[in-house]
Amino acid sequence: MASAGAGSTGHLDCMLLNAAIGINVTHVPYRGGGPAMQDLIAGRIDYFCTLSATARQQVDGKLIKAIAILSRDRSAMLPELASAREQGLDFEATTWFGFFFPKGTPEPIIQKLHDATVAAMDTPSVQERLKEVGAVTVASERRSPAYLQKFVLSEIEKNAAPIKAAGLAMD
């Protein structure tokens, strides 16, 4: 199994997938997704967890075979590809981004920056660009700083046991 680097999102997602299906494999960390993709195309690695936007061109060119989308639902980037859940695996892994501020940042500043970020994310040009790279924004009820805080804590809880079981640690 290859990833774009130790501790990368792809590494964590593949590791969680491996745990969900009960396999133990050797992790081959690369210095970025490009070299890993090259070795996948060349047949030097067995599989690679990466973003659908990263793999789309190679999938379309039939250079690689996509197996599953790891998010709950199908991706707009690869709509023909079933999710792992649709294929019978009770598993979900997604890449997400949040905006974080230093501890102690005054609430009015957080709210002002939050509101500006949400407004920018909702513009047609940003929505179009996100669509081009296979990304989506979350529903409005999931956009608050309080929701993000709860979500981050739930992600830590969800991932802690598999990370520990795999023996992963920060270097």
Show the residue positions of the predicted features.
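Conserved, function-defining micro-sites of small-solute handling proteins
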Residues: 1-171
